[in-house]
């Protein structure tokens, strides 16, 4: 499996935003948030931090995106999204393993509690639940291996 992780292209910001919006639409309790405010924040974050995002290419074809950055002395995986047609192929696992091996710091991320498939994967890779955030998300973490 030939997977590479080049930086995103500026014109992909809107695509990443659309993926993030889909995750919010699919898994967030929309009645409990200010939807427009959340989406505006997501858009600003992606635009401001675009240099921290990576493309996930499988054999040169776009399979997904993610952001890996330092946050309070730890490393956060943010906005990990694998395109539906590439799910179940081990690509998400490879991204997570790459992040773990790229650092010796603790790696963490937020995941929606309704995203049971992702949580099952994360637990199988040794991530544990650190903290519940509101009613819809949890933080999962694991020590880096770098």
Give the ranges of each region predicted by the language model.
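Active-site acidic-Proline motif in GNAT/NAT acetyltransferases
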Residues: 83-85, 89, 113-114
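Acetyl-CoA-dependent GNAT
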Residues: 7-79, 83-84, 98, 131-134
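Conserved N-terminal entry element of GNAT/NAT acetyltransferase domains
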Residues: 1-14, 144-146
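Conserved acetyl-CoA pyrophosphate-binding loop and the N-cap/start of the following alpha-helix
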Residues: 86, 90-98
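Conserved beta-strand-loop-alpha-helix junction that forms the acyl-donor binding cleft
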Residues: 108-119, 135-145
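Alpha-helical interaction/dimerization surfaces of two-component signaling modules
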Residues: 19-23, 102, 121, 125
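Conserved active-site alpha-helix within GNAT-family acetyltransferase domains
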Residues: 93, 114-131
């Amino acid at each position: 499996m030939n997977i590479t992780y080049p930086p995103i292209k500026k014109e992909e910001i809107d695509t990443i935003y659309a993926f993030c919006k889909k995750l919010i639409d699919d898994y967030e309790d929309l009645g409990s948030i200010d939807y427009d405010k959340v989406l505006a924040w997501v858009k600003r974050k992606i635009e401001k931090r675009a240099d921290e995002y990576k493309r996930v290419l499988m054999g040169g074809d776009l399979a997904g995106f993610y952001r890996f950055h330092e946050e309070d002395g730890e490393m956060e995986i943010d906005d990990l999204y694998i395109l539906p047609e590439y799910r179940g192929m081990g690509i998400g696992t490879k991204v997570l393993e790459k992040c773990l091996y790229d650092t010796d710091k603790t790696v963490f991320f937020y995941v929606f509690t309704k995203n049971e498939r992702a949580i099952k994967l994360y637990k199988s890779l040794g991530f544990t639940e650190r903290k519940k955030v509101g009613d819809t998300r949890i933080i999962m973490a694991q020590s880096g291996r770098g």
